[in-house]
Regions:
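Canonical Rossmann dinucleotide-binding motif of NAD(H)/NADP(H)-dependent dehydrogenases/reductases
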Residues: 2-33
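Conserved glycine-rich Rossmann-like NAD(P)H-binding loop of the short-chain dehydrogenase/reductase
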Residues: 28-44
Length: 280
């Protein structure tokens, strides 16, 4: 996969993994459209990337807003022409909370950003990427939590949205077979980002910014994570190698193997049941 001279559209680009991806893209000569809901941070990120010999353009956008995403895509094409890479990276979390305690507005927010935001990116930009026929890739950011629900974190709503992104990415890869566009899903484990501060990015229509309980503890925990720059380099290496699942850590392999063992045990159970080994 060639990178230099092409253009990428990155959501959640103002900080964290999104900015790490942008830095890796810039080092590889890719022009970048930075999309994020935080205008001030967006301009800081754009200013930093100006030190690289690439073109950049910043767009303030709420990815959960379909019409706003359409306008952002139009603006990106007007500025750069063809888009080759789409990184659907924007995401939020509510932290640990029993599912039954979540309000409709909280469900709307986390689903709107984490799932509908990715859908909006695919719906808006993939047809344009396919139409020009040049090689590219779509990378959707899920999480290792999109393959197993962490029993310690108890962030079921977040995991639910990330499971959805894994399935969405698998379906997208099938839909894109035979085209010049690939698809990948990024499943990072612990990364040093500002995901813990998602609450400051909640839009007014869903209640506005708020102070999330436990945010300080989450910040301390996340600070021990992998750097976003390392994630960015890993992502581009995987895209160049046409990898579908993009992992950032080796340790979660055991967690996933244990989960799959429970799934296989379920099939063993139905096999015994059908063979007459019933318990009732």
């Amino acid at each position: 996969m060639e990178f230099s001279g092409k253009t990428a559209f990155v959501t959640g680009a103002a900080n964290g993994i999104g900015l790490g991806i942008c830095r890796a893209l810039a080092r590889n000569g890719v022009n970048i459209v930075l999309a994020d809901i935080e205008r001030a941070q967006l301009e800081i990120a754009r200013g930093e990337l100006a030190t690289f010999n690439v073109r950049t353009h910043a767009i303030e956008v709420d990815v959960s807003d379909a019409a706003a995403f359409d306008r952002a895509a139009d603006q990106a094409e007007a500025e750069f022409g063809n888009i080759h890479f789409l990184f659907n990276n924007a995401g939020v979390t509510l932290g640990a909370m029993p599912l039954w305690e979540m309000t409709p507005a909280q469900w709307d927010w986390i689903f709107g950003v984490n799932v509908q935001g990715v859908i909006n990116g695919i719906r808006t930009l993939v047809p344009r990427m396919r139409s020009h026929g040049e090689a590219g890739d779509v990378v959707n950011t899920a999480s290792i939590g999109g393959l197993q629900v962490n029993p310690k974190l108890r962030n079921g709503s977040y995991a639910m949205t990330k499971y959805a992104i894994v399935a969405l990415s698998e379906a997208l890869a099938l839909d894109l077979e035979g085209s010049a566009i690939g698809a990948s899903v990024l499943c990072p484990a612990l990364v040093n980002t500002t995901l813990h501060a998602s609450s400051r990015r909640r839009p007014t229509r869903l209640g506005g910014p708020y102070e999330r309980p436990g945010a300080d503890a989450a910040k301390a925990w996340q600070s021990a994570g992998l750097s976003p720059d390392e994630v960015g380099m890993r992502v581009l290496d995987a895209v160049a190698a046409s990898e579908f699942f993009i992992f950032t850590h080796e340790e979660p392999r055991l967690w996933i193997e244990r989960r799959h063992a429970r799934i296989i045990a379920g099939f063993d159970s139905i096999e015994r049941y059908n063979a007459g080994g019933r318990t009732t």
